[in-house]
């Protein structure tokens, strides 16, 4: 092989290596670009799924009169999510008069409303007032605060009493204490009240996570 031929061979090999190197770099860039694109698509999919899940959650977890709830929660020193959860359990934010005569968002019986009016020093109360959301939530929130005070802040007992009445819950608590323990959700004798308490306490957490801004939690 002549010197010139050897030089040409080396140049050819170098050129091939250069072409191969450029092809490898181009392939690497294409792979990187594809990975970045896939990452962007995956991120968009996650964001869309999150928004869809949030929207679906809101469909199954309605909220109206948020301003009224925030106001009453602040005035009565209550968790606004608890008020919302009680409304959800009582009327699902679509109030109708019950067969027992309970009215409004928080399904307050007229006799309970008169009791609350007496406790709070209210005057000029009429039963038709219970159909007004702001009044209904004010009365229901006052009653929740009263029950929480009666049970030293125990939300489970207060919610149980909202459903079953003070006399029943007081009797259950006394019985549990006589046995050396305390009343638990599982030990609530009334199946309806047991399910009600579970529903309210679960919905309370759901409202906190789904509507933190609307309920003034952040």
Model feature map: region roles:
Residues 1-29:
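N-terminal Lys/Arg-rich, disordered targeting/topogenic segments
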Residues 1-5, 36, 215:
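Intrinsic-disorder/low-complexity peptide segments enriched for small residues
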Residues 11, 17, 32, 179-180, ...:
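Feature targets compositionally biased, intrinsically disordered low-complexity regions
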Residues 22, 44, 62-63:
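Short juxtamembrane and helix-loop transition motifs at transmembrane-helix boundaries
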Residues 23-36, 103:
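Extended, non-globular alpha-helical segments
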Residues 32-50:
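Hydrophobic membrane-insertion alpha-helices, especially the h-region
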Residues 48-218:
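Catalytic glycan-binding domains that act on GlcNAc-containing polysaccharides
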């Amino acid at each position: 092989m002549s010197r010139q031929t050897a030089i040409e061979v080396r140049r050819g090999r170098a050129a091939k290596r250069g072409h191969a190197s450029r092809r490898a770099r181009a392939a690497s860039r294409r792979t990187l670009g594809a990975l970045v694109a896939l990452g962007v698509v995956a991120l968009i999919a996650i964001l869309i799924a999150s928004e869809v899940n949030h929207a679906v959650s809101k469909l199954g977890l309605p909220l109206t009169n948020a301003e009224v709830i925030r106001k009453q929660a602040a005035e009565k020193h209550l968790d606004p999510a608890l008020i919302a959860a009680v409304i959800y359990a009582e009327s699902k934010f679509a109030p109708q008069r019950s067969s027992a005569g309970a009215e409004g968002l928080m399904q307050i019986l007229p006799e309970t409303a008169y009791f609350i009016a007496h406790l709070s020093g209210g005057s000029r109360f009429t039963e038709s007032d219970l159909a007004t959301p702001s009044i209904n939530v004010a009365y229901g929130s006052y009653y929740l605060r009263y029950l929480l005070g009666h049970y030293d802040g125990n939300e489970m007992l207060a919610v149980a009493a909202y459903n079953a009445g003070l006399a029943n819950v007081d009797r259950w608590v006394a019985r549990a204490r006589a046995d050396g323990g305390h009343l638990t959700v599982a030990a609530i004798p009334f199946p309806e009240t047991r399910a009600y308490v579970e529903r309210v306490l679960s919905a309370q957490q759901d409202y906190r996570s789904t509507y933190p801004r609307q309920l003034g939690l952040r």
